Amino acid sequence: MQPLQQENIRLAATVMLIRDHPLGLQVYMVKRPGRGDFPDLHVFPGGKVDEDDWQPDLCPMLTDQEASARLGVAAGGLRYWVAVARECFEECGVLLANAAGGPVQLDAAQQASIGQSRQNLLQGNMSWVTVLQLSLIHI
């Protein structure tokens, strides 16, 4: 394995999705495909930070300063926030978002539309920004 150096370090973000359950806490993990890096391992959702993840308008309820403070980084925390939301949606269909500052309530037609948007995103036919703009949802 090559030693870490400034030029080979990639920004990445991972999230632990945890919820209360009558039998105890539940932790959400995904199984990686049998090919590529870390085949067949169970991991937390996440991945590399894309250039498009640095878009403050995707998070109107959170500033970079606030995100950075919550994540314990000096600056640029908002790009990790956006990256983790995008990766969760891409990898497992979990949409970490809000609408007008509250929980997102989707009817069946909206769920189907967002599901189709996810397929378009995975096929490279739609950007993450477009998914959010079409659904009127914010991270």
What name fits each language-model region?
Residues 4-5, 74:
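Short, N-terminal intrinsically disordered low-complexity segments that are rich in Pro/Gly
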Residues 29, 35-36, 77, 125:
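Hydrophobic alpha-helical segments and their boundary regions
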